Amino acid sequence: MTDARQAASRRAVLFGATAIGLCAVWTRTADAEEATLTPDAALAKVQSGEILLIDVRTPDEWARTGLPEGGTALDMRRDDFTQALLALAEGQTDRPIALICASGGRSGHMTRELSRAGFTRIIDVPEGMLGSRAGPGWLERGLPVTQP
């Protein structure tokens, strides 16, 4: 093979590798963007049965503010949290599950932890119940709550 052909072949390989790498980055970015919901979207999806909405806050917090309508209370401090969540998801680690807390910190943390534990469709509601940098939150948006 001539030097010119070898150089052209190397460029083609590098171009292909770069294109594949860019596609992988784009795909991961798209997945990350899909892994959050606004409170309005979470309410719509829980009402339509598309997601299981889990409030990971404490019983004291639930008593003060109520639970998001359609949500299930599951204190993230429970020793059996993962097993209890799996039971609520009827054993389906691929079931879409949205997590909400007060302001997005704990739900974000648990989103990562549950993904590491094998759950494949965990979604964060980063505004939380009280609001955060992500937005005003469930309560400020005037979304419905139920008492625990």
Each model region followed by its residue ranges:
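Short hydrophobic beta-strand that contains or immediately precedes a catalytic carboxylate
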Residues: L53-V56
